[in-house]
Amino acid sequence: MDQHIRIGFVSTRLAGTDGVSLETRKWSHILTDLGHECFYFAGESDWPEARSYVVPEAHFNHPEIRALNADLFDHYARSPQTSQRIQALQLHLKTHLYEFVRSFDLGLLIVENALSIPMNIPLGLALAELIAETHLPTIGHHHDFGWERKRFKVTAASDYQLGAFPPILHSVHHVVINSYGARQLALRTGVSSVLIPNVMDFDTPPPEPDAYSAAVRPALGIAPDDYLLLQPTRVVPRKRIEQAIELARRLNSKCTLLVSHSSGDEGTAYETYLRTLADLLDVRLVFASDVIGYERSQAPDGRKLFTLADIYQQADLVTYPSTVEGFGNAFLEAIYYRRPIVMSTYEIFRRDIEPKGFRVIGFEDFITEETVRQAQAILRDPALAAEMTRHNYELGRRYYSYRILEKSLVVLLNQILGI
């Protein structure tokens, strides 16, 4: 068998700085370095056009998909029209998936979360049917599952969810990013999985701050003497950003809390609540997703667009008070960019990450006086912060580097394809 294969990544969106898109980039980078060729199917893609196959209906934010989800979730019955439209969209997407496989002569699919969480049910059904009909070797890379999300618990789509999220098919090989996901997948479906955690390129240190990244503060109206607290997540309730606002208030120092991402697919009500709370507590809150991209560039209105790296380099402290995380990309990013972090010790962190020895300012259900005291100490003592972040970086290099991902992917491809 040819040792180099053509691989197709499939997701609802492969663009921007969300966790799935970022991890896809890392997998693609490693697989390309190993000599394989990678191609991309999604509702939105910022990969080169020659390697992308874009079908708008594959995006979870497509109007038809949003309309379907409105009838499928928070209800126990769906309309016949919804069922008919799902079937029509499934066929439409399956036709394009067949063409994607044919036109790029693919030998392996890697499905990024589109067989894990039912944000686009027609796409999941189309993928499951394609795989069942072709027996095409497939990796289901599961970042989080539908049963982990509150909004998918009341459903008129349980028949679809059981069939495709995830599908139990002989040629689908399941990869999860945490041990809890592996146990739940086995308990609920009886199938085994491979655990491959998220990673960062710890063997290549982050770039040093430069004049471009120094423009972050003036561009966002943040004073040079303000402490910049970075909340590097989407604006969704499970991120508990209200606790980051509370921390900023209780530090009793000049602070700006910057939120890096948008709300994504979960509406704007939570953002409105956060703005109101910040006003009540007299905390400066900046939502900066409109000036953050994957690469440095310029917006149509002339504003500079910054990378996440630029934002991290200007941050004094990272806040991460989530109740639930599939793994914790923001945690790894904070470690990589050598920033101290105040965070809730969510379940996956306690099970999979904390035992490795990382040093964080941790709390459980609420921010305590001790949490505030430790955060103040870190902000006021650069030497203490430097020692904490140096220690964490070395652990990150040991456990979550690209080398670890490369070894895991080599073994996985050998098991699936014998290469």
Where are these regions (language model features)?
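Nucleotide-activated donor-binding/catalytic signature segment of Leloir-type glycosyltransferases, i.e.
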Residues: A223, T268-D310
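A charged, aromatic-enriched C-terminal amphipathic alpha-helix characteristic of glycosyltransferases
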Residues: R380-N414
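Short hydrophobic beta-strand element within catalytic cores of glycosyltransferases
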Residues: P340-S344, V360-I361
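Conserved donor-binding/catalytic core segment of Leloir-type glycosyltransferases
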Residues: F9, R217-P218, I222-K239, I245-A248, ...
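Donor nucleotide-sugar binding/catalytic pocket of nucleotide-sugar-dependent glycosyltransferases
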Residues: W147, Y160-A215
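A conserved catalytic-core segment of Leloir-type glycosyltransferases
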Residues: D2-H4, I30-D33, F39-L108, L280, ...
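Aromatic "clamp/platform" in nucleotide-sugar-dependent glycosyltransferases that forms part
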Residues: T323
